[in-house]
Swiss-Prot record:
Organism for this UniProt entry: Arabidopsis thaliana (Mouse-ear cress)
Protein's UniProt keywords contain Repeat: yes
Organism lineage string: Eukaryota, Viridiplantae, Streptophyta, Embryophyta, Tracheophyta
Gene expressing this chain: COL5
Domain of life: Eukaryota
Keyword Transmembrane: no
Protein name, per record: Zinc finger protein CONSTANS-LIKE 5
Major subcellular site: nucleus
Length: 355
């Protein structure tokens, strides 16, 4: 949506100068600029002067009202001069993307040009009783953003509407009456729409309930809803907890309340879950106690020597106050001789001991 003319004028403070007055009468604000005469004229003077001479003229800038207009901004619906166009459309990146076209010159009088503009605009044709042919400009399916098969056949028929002040009163939707059929799709289906008035404030698409398919045995069949916020619906079976979004794009309802017939009491679920966990933990404890008792029965308290060679070497090492001490050369000789004497005492005479 474009800026209004008053908001455009308030963007810069340099446009506070008075509007250019008419060069002919010097009393009325100029509205057009004649390029041949290089004169600014009001509508009355322009009609009087250019009734017979068809000079090329343009409108005066609608913002500063000091220079002839150079471009027309479609977003702002305003004719702007070169300086005002540069100032306004360089204010921000959004304004710089406005579509602008060179201003159109006219050769008729200003009153005739104003009458043509008012007749071509939507608001200008409401005051006169004229016949508008809606098929004068062909409406393509691509322009509506729709596929060709979505358009009814009667859209291609010529349609003429008598537009006037008498016909327009009380009928603000005369342009959109035919397009309501494009939005209201009704497909034949087996869905039964039931609106759930639960007192909610926000609006959401109406939830519908599908009819169950004929089955021979429903004992082990569960209808699961993947859109529910409660996880209890996956554990506890119910008759029908599935909900689907309405196929109509304009059908709305209120937010359903959580207190429905298909909901399960949370306290019951919590108590049953807690009781099962307590029973499992007690059984695990009893199993651990039994395993501990079996190990205690098979426990042996007898002393075993794993490395006999290490024990023998430790007994032969010298000790000082019960602790191991380092051996010296003299001690090694004494130990050797003591072993020799001990072995000779127990051996027979003349036999060389062996080690």
């Amino acid at each position: 949506m474009g800026f209004g003319l008053e908001s455009i004028k308030s963007i810069s403070g340099g446009w506070g100068a008075a509007a250019r007055s008419c060069d002919a009468c010097k009393s009325v604000t100029a509205a057009v600029f004649c390029r041949v005469d290089s004169a600014f004229l009001c509508i009355a003077c322009d009609t009087r002067i250019h009734s017979f001479t068809r000079h090329e003229r343009v409108w005066v800038c609608e913002v500063c009202e000091q220079a002839p207009a150079a471009v027309t901004c479609k977003a702002d619906a305003a004719a702007l001069c070169v300086s005002c166009d540069a100032d306004i459309h360089s204010a921000n990146p959004l304004a710089s993307r406005h579509e602008r076209v060179p201003v159109e010159t006219f050769f008729d009088s200003a009153e005739t040009a104003v009458a043509k503009i008012s007749a071509s605009s939507t608001f200008g044709i409401l005051g006169s009783s004229t016949t508008v042919d809606l098929t004068a400009v062909p409406v393509m399916a691509d322009d509506l953003g729709l596929c060709p098969w979505l358009l009814p056949n009667d859209f291609n028929e010529p349609a003429k509407i008598e537009i006037g002040t008498e016909n327009m009163k009380g009928s603000s939707d005369f342009m959109f009456s035919d397009f309501d059929r494009l939005i209201d799709f009704e497909f034949p289906n087996s869905f039964n729409h039931h609106q759930n008035n639960a007192g909610g404030d926000s609006l959401v698409p109406v939830q519908t309930k599908t009819e169950p398919l004929p089955l021979t045995n429903n004992d082990h069949c569960f209808d699961i809803d993947f859109c529910r916020s409660k996880l209890s619906a996956f554990t506890y079976p119910s008759q029908s907890v599935s909900h689907s979004v309405s196929t109509s794009s304009i059908e709305y309802g209120v937010v359903p309340d959580g207190n429905t017939n298909n909901s399960v009491n949370r306290s019951t679920i919590t108590s049953s879950t807690t009781g099962g966990d307590h029973q499992a933990s007690s059984m695990d404890r009893e199993a651990r106690v039994l395993r501990y008792r079996e190990k205690r029965k098979n426990r042996k308290f007898e002393k075993t020597i794993r490395y006999a060679s290490r024990k023998a070497y430790a007994e032969s090492r010298p000790r000082i106050k019960g602790r191991f001490a380092k051996r010296t050369e003299t001690e090694n000789d004494d130990i050797f001789l003591s072993h020799v004497y001990a072995s000779a005492a127990h051996a027979q005479y003349g036999v060389v001991p062996t080690f």
